[in-house]
A protein has these predicted regions:
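A ligand-binding cleft/hinge motif common to bilobed small-molecule-binding domains
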Residues: 80-83, 231-252
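Periplasmic-binding protein-like
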Residues: 198-207, 213, 251-272
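Mature extracytoplasmic/periplasmic domains
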Residues: 274-335
Length: 361
C-alpha cells in the first residue's frame, strides 16, 4: 500500500520543470518501497531518480487522464489500470527490454490479466488484501475477549462501532475498497454495480459513520502503531507495518491483522508507463531493476506486502514469506474476491455516495 523518499519529492516541489533524458520520474504510493533501492537504482544505472508519492488512486487517475503528468512510471491498482488502459493512458511495454520479466509469478500474472490482458501494459509490483487491523488489547477492553476481530461485524455492526469509537477507528479513503466490503457484510455481491444494491452499501456505511474518526489511506499506520486508534480498516501490509513499528517502539501495543471471514478484497498494484512518458528507456530500466529477484525481495521485506515475483521468494525473510496474512494459504485464497471497474455512470453514483459517507450528511 510504502515509504516516501523526501529528497526526491523535494525535487518535484522545487526542482526541474522539464525532465531530462537522464532523469526517471516515478509516481508511487506512499510508504511503499525501501528507499535504499532508490539510491541503488541511481548507482547502478546512472539515471537521476525523481520519486514522488500519492495516497489515492483518484489522485493518480486525475493526473493521468489530464495528460502531461511528467511521470515515466506510475503504480495504479488493477481496477483503475483497466479503465486507464481503455482510455489510452498507457503505452505497451517492450518486453525485449525487460529480461527480468522471466522472474514474474504465473499465478499472479493470471489474476492480473483480468485487468490487463496478456499483461501487455503492466507488471505486478505488490498485491495484498483489505481487512481489519486491531489494537488487540484495547479492542478486548472495549468489546471483551470474544470480540469478532476477524469479522466484518467488527466495523459494520453499529453496536460494536459505537463502543469502539471511544478508542478510535480509521477507514481507508477508498470507495473501491470500502463499498465492496460493506456489500460483503450485508450478503450482497461485492462486485455489484446495481444502483439499488449500492444504496444498501450506503445505508450500511451511514449506520456506522458517526463512529469513524477519520478516512485516510496512510495515516492509520502510525495511528495504530502508536495506540492512537484501536481499529483500522485498511491494507494488509500497512497494518503489518504498524504491528512492526509498535514492536520496534516496545510501546506495549499489540497490533493484529485479519482478512474477514466473510471474504476479503484481493488487490494488485501494477507498474505501468504513461503514453506520454518523457523517458521510456529509463522507465523500462526502472521496471527491469524492480523485477530483479533480490530487489523485489528487498521491497517486500521492507513493506510487508506480497509481490508478483516468483524468483524473489527465496530471498524473502521468514516474517514475510511465512506469514499467511501476507502470503495466504489455500483456504484463505479461496475466500478472497476481486472486483471490476465502475463504468462512468456507476462511478458518478459511487462518487456521490462516498462524498455523502465522508461528510456524514
Amino acid at each position: 500500500m510504502k515509504q516516501s523518499w523526501l529528497p526526491m519529492a523535494a525535487l518535484l516541489a522545487f526542482g526541474a520543470v522539464a525532465a531530462s533524458a537522464e532523469e526517471v520520474r516515478v509516481y508511487n504510493w506512499s510508504d511503499y518501497i525501501d528507499e535504499e533501492l532508490l539510491a541503488k537504482f541511481e548507482a547502478e544505472t546512472g539515471y537521476d531518480l525523481v520519486y514522488d508519492v500519492f495516497d489515492s488512486n483518484e489522485v493518480l487517475e486525475t493526473k493521468l487522464l489530464a495528460g502531461g503528468s511528467g511521470y515515466d512510471v506510475v503504480v495504479p491498482t488493477g481496477t483503475f489500470l483497466q479503465r486507464q488502459i481503455q482510455a489510452g493512458a498507457f503505452q505497451p511495454l517492450d518486453y525485449s527490454k525487460l529480461p527480468n520479466s522471466g522472474n514474474l509469478w504465473d499465478v499472479i500474472k493470471d489474476r492480473t490479466a483480468q485487468y490487463d490482458p496478456d499483461n501487455a501494459y503492466s507488471i505486478n509490483y505488490m498485491w495484498g488484501t483489505t481487512g481489519i487491523g486491531v489494537n488487540v488489547g484495547k479492542v478486548a477492553e472495549v468489546l471483551g475477549a470474544d470480540a469478532p476481530i476477524n469479522s466484518l461485524a467488527l466495523v459494520f455492526d453499529p453496536a460494536n462501532m459505537e463502543k469502539l469509537a471511544s478508542c478510535g477507528v480509521h477507514f481507508l479513503d477508498a470507495p473501491t475498497e470500502i463499498i465492496p466490503a460493506a456489500l460483503a457484510y450485508i450478503g450482497e455481491d461485492p462486485d455489484s454495480k446495481d444502483p439499488e444494491v449500492l444504496a444498501k452499501a450506503e445505508e450500511a456505511l451511514m449506520a456506522v459513520r458517526p463512529y469513524i474518526q477519520k478516512f485516510h489511506s496512510s495515516e492509520y499506520i502510525n495511528a495504530l502503531a502508536n495506540g492512537e486508534i484501536c481499529v483500522a480498516f485498511g491494507w494488509s501490509g500497512d497494518i503489518l507495518q504498524a504491528r512492526d513499528r509498535a514492536a520496534e517502539a516496545d510501546n506495549g501495543v499489540d497490533v493484529a491483522y485479519n482478512a474477514p471471514t466473510e471474504g476479503a478484497l484481493m488487490w494488485f498494484d501494477q507498474m505501468a508507463v504513461p503514453v506520454d512518458a518523457p523517458n521510456v528507456e529509463g522507465a523500462h530500466a526502472f521496471l527491469n531493476f524492480i523485477m530483479d529477484a533480490n530487489n523485489m525481495a528487498a521491497a517486500s521485506n521492507y513493506v510487508y506486502y506480497a509481490n508478483g515475483n516468483k524468483a524473489s521468494q527465496e530471498f524473502l525473510i521468514e516474517d514475510v514469506i511465512g506469514d499467511t496474512a501476507i502470503y495466504p494459504d489455500e483456504a484463505t485464497l479461496a475466500n478472497l474476491y476481486t472486483v471490476t471497474p465502475f463504468d462512468a455512470g456507476v462511478q458518478r453514483t459511487v462518487t456521490r455516495l462516498w462524498t455523502k459517507v465522508k461528510s456524514g450528511q
